[in-house]
Curated annotation (Swiss-Prot):
Leading EC class: hydrolase
Location(s), subcellular: Cytoplasm
Cofactor: Zn(2+)
GO annotation terms (biological process): rRNA processing
Family membership: Belongs to the endoribonuclease YbeY family.
Species of the source: Flavobacterium psychrophilum (strain ATCC 49511 / DSM 21280 / CIP 103535 / JIP02/86)
Metal-binding as UniProt keyword: yes
Entry EC number(s): 3.1.-.-
UniProt name for this protein: Endoribonuclease YbeY
Predominant subcellular localization, coarse grouping: cytoplasm
GO MF terms held by the record: metalloendopeptidase activity; RNA endonuclease activity; zinc ion binding
Domain of life: Bacteria
Known function: Single strand-specific metallo-endoribonuclease involved in late-stage 70S ribosome quality control and in maturation of the 3' terminus of the 16S rRNA.
Amino acid sequence: MISFNYEIDFEIREETSYINWVSSVILSENKSEGEINYIFCDDNYLLEINQQYLNHDTLTDVISFDYSLGDEIHGDIYISIERVRENADDFKVPFEEELKRVMIHGVLHYCGYKDKSDADELLMRSKEDEKLKLFHVKQN
């Protein structure tokens, strides 16, 4: 089950499309869907988590806590909407594209992809690009 939780004044439009997309990404990696919670927050909220649990005193766009059991994906993905907006401006991409990239970044970590080395980061970016193409908005 994929759920969205909002700690700020923000809400995803077309939640079902996003849920279906995340599910399809998980299946495309030969994993099964467990419980994934997205928590959308602001910089201060995520900074507190970064300091408390990871001992990092920096702003970040996403932090994911992986509770996966074998091939069943479980976890909490915290996303700073402020950071995503700023990154979208910096990278000159639409906000929703950057949001989807960050959302799927956490899931890809659960699937085993890393981003610590340059080679890992290149593979992660390539996988993000691949998975962004799987997103479809259902037309009524």
